[in-house]
A protein has these predicted regions:
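Short donor-sugar binding/catalytic loops of nucleotide-sugar-dependent glycosyltransferases
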Residues: 189, 207-211, 237
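Conserved donor-binding/catalytic core segment of Leloir-type glycosyltransferases
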Residues: 163, 196-214, 219-226, 232
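Acidic anion/phosphate-binding donor-loop and adjacent secondary structure
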Residues: 174-175, 180-202
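Membrane-proximal helix-turn-helix segments that form the acceptor-binding/catalytic region
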Residues: 99, 111-161
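Short N-terminal targeting/anchoring amphipathic segment
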Residues: 51-70, 89-94
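Carbohydrate-associated surface elements
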Residues: 5, 168, 189
Length: 237
């Protein structure tokens, strides 16, 4: 495992190499001034990751949620390490959101509360135009620059396979021709449990995080319209 050092870390690597915790809500004024640069490119992540690569000698690197804290600069270090050591290593990325095609990662404009796909196809300037990150022009500009920078670098071409948790997510990722030949839909795993027969009941189940971009508001409106139908909500948020 390689990632950011933080209190919740429950796995690790043999040489204890991690990046520093980035607290976007705290820290000194000086550290906050450097965050915009660090969220786009992280030299520290490359240095620390190289230590793990040299020690572990992986055949496959499986990436998750690397934007902003670790940054895609990790991909460049993996590629560099492979070239310098003549070691073959595949790069697999599991997409947990739409970050690589939408700078605010939700495909939803938090200001208009509407689903939005304006950035699909690499038109990331729309993120700044819509103030899509926390309603802030400055933060949205940083998000736009991060997306444009890595598009310009062409770094994502080194990803061999991109795992999407649904066919819907796959269809959105495929809007980028670079990803279209690399995506596969694979649902998140669940623990196997013994099936037990229960009394059949008619109801509509929402299972997931209570978050606006998931359409929870629309479902609540439907609940009001269909008061004779039982709706069950299971999740947190």
């Amino acid at each position: 495992y390689f990632g950011m050092e933080h209190k919740g870390r429950c796995v690790g690597n043999r040489i204890n190499a991690y990046t520093s915790d980035m607290d976007f809500h705290g820290g000194s004024k000086l550290s906050k001034l450097t965050y915009p640069i660090k969220t786009i490119y992280s030299k520290e992540a490359r240095v620390q990751l190289r230590k793990v690569l040299d020690d572990f000698q992986p055949d496959v690197c499986h990436l998750n949620n690397f934007n902003y804290q670790l940054t895609p600069s990790m991909i460049l270090e993996i590629v560099k390490w492979c070239k310098e050591t003549n070691h073959q290593c595949k790069i697999i990325f599991t997409a947990h959101d739409y970050q690589l095609v939408c700078p605010n990662h939700m495909l939803n404009n938090p200001n208009t509360h509407q689903n939005c796909e304006k950035c699909l196809g690499g038109h990331f300037v729309n993120c700044m135009k819509g103030k899509c990150i926390h309603g802030s022009t400055a933060k949205s500009a940083i998000g736009m620059m991060e997306a444009e920078f890595w598009k310009w670098k062409g770094t994502y071409k080194y990803i061999d396979t991109m795992i999407c948790c649904s066919e819907f997510m796959k269809s959105k990722m495929d809007s980028n021709p670079l990803f279209a030949t690399k995506t596969v839909a694979m649902h998140n795993f669940i623990d196997k449990v013994e099936w037990k027969e229960t009394e059949k009941k008619d109801y509509v189940l929402y299972f997931g995080r209570f978050s606006e971009e998931k359409g929870i508001g629309t479902l609540i409106k439907v609940c009001k319209e269909l008061q004779d139908v039982q709706f069950i909500f299971a999740g947190t948020g």
